[in-house]
């Protein structure tokens, strides 16, 4: 089995491509060892001690190293854990855990106004068709969280969370795109 590795715009995060599906649907972001308890693979990666984030995409796993940790030391251990997991063909999640994770919109306190339904549908469609595929190429994901008075709220996950260029991507790329196609959008914010 060959697991390819790609760099991401976030120097602390590497994207690992096992050559097979990782998630059947959706994505899953683990920001702590406690969150990772839902997945044997994520738990094993966090057990290395130098991992601060794990993200499962459709066909990749992004791993974020702790500050000051070099990938030359960490990468062989991560590859070993990934290889063992995928060769053993064990489930990605514990039986009691739900794998698919797109947080409910009201988690961040944003309740969409039903009067904005058409605008919100346009925003979600653009995010799904134009933004998420590009962000997935960089080892991350972006999730719609809400729309209020011209402001769009998005959650960055995986390699995008904590990436030095994520604010530029959000403002120069995503905000410009949404403003161009949806005139009601005045600003985009990360939550």
Label each PLM-derived region with a short phrase.
Residues 1-191:
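Domain-level signature for proteins that mediate thiol-based redox and metal-cofactor handling
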